[in-house]
Amino acid sequence: MNLEFAPSDFSCPCIIGFQHESDARRFLEEMRKRLGEFALSLHPEKTRLIEFGRFAAERRKRCGLGKPDIFNFLGFTFICGKTRTGQFQIKRKSRADRMRAKLREIKVMLRRCMHQPIPDQGKWLYYVVRGYFNYHAVPTNSRALVAFRTEIARRWRRVLTRRSERTKLNWKQMKQLIDTWLPPPRILHPWPDKRFAVSHPR
């Protein structure tokens, strides 16, 4: 059972997990009381109690409630999923709405720098893609990385094609530019259990 909440008077989003629903509801009630003592309150639209976790799918199936809810947090959508061997796995996917917004922003910028030299455009797009991957390249998010890079390449090709009606850019030529300037999609971050297991000398 997950409790997702955010105080309404300041930005402090948080996700808290509980094994039992009764514990989650009791905590939520105590949190409301505690914040009320300081004239604060939880955001009514961002605070919710959802059934999520290893046994959520099985319990909801028995009750005829369908799949477990998903939730968004820090730019990712969290989903109850399974590995290829059928084991439970929490999957993280880049938020689709955030990705679309980022692509729209890049489209506008590409149009503004349409007539700049291709190497200058390539360098800029390299840092755009690398920056996106540095945050989003987590396990279970490979498809989103591929999709982001592909959409960047498509928008870049459109800009390069439009800036000169005489020069047509075929996909073979475009592929050379893509391979030269756009970093390939690959997972950069370890699984959470591997990261949390790291110990540092004192």
Question: PLM features: what roles do these ranges have?
Answer:
Residues 1-202:
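Non-catalytic terminal/accessory segments
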